[in-house]
Amino acid sequence: MIREVQGIILMLVGIVILRISWGTAYLDYVKESMRPWLLASGAILVILGVLALVDALRRGGVSEAEAQRSDEEIVFDGVEGDHDHAHGGPRAAWLLVLPILVVFVVAPPALGAWAAARDTTNSVAAQQALPPLPPGDPVPVFLSDYVTRAVWEQGVSLEGRTVELTGFAVSTDDGGWQLARMQIQCCAADAFASKVQPVGLPPDFADVPENTWLTVTGQWVPGDAAADGSPGATPSSSAIPLVQVGSIAVVPEPVNPYD
């Protein structure tokens, strides 16, 4: 690979990073707080690509082999097979094209029902006491927050309150569905699902296609859908709490699909 192409690829990778982080597409992959770092990384790659391209153009008549030998300071005189070793790096640089193709051809969506259905961790124990819910009903609550309060606090802070939960439908083995939403700490690679089991569904919502986004308004009731009907949401990372449905509506996917 000639040095000009190396510089162009660096610029393209930087442009792709800037493109997805300038709008809201980056929220499908990382937390909102990562945006400044993405913008900085994209800008640095673009600058490095421009510098590499300018340097290649300045060299003009210098052959690719000579330029590479000068840059890497390879001195293997008399050693057989040096030529192949020297060109291993430039060949590997073609891998930088992959993220460009992924974003422009088959950009992956945010994690949804497929990932949630295969996740057995539904919550993690709170490290400290959770604050009371704000006044006023219904109160919007993150799905992960609802699960934590229902499981690890036995629903104490939810009792008698009407909550509003937003997530996507995940099919269950018995032909029903659960409301789920993925939670991330840093990026999609460390995501896990928070799921609740709606009970008392109206007939129109008995069967909902997977990945349909819904807002459920209702109240906490004791129970654990992961315990085969056993009473009580026992403190367990796999427990799936219940929510008694008061109303339900199909909604657009949020700009930020993660909790």
Summary of predicted features, one role per range:
Residues 1-259:
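OB-fold and OB-like single-stranded nucleic-acid-recognition modules
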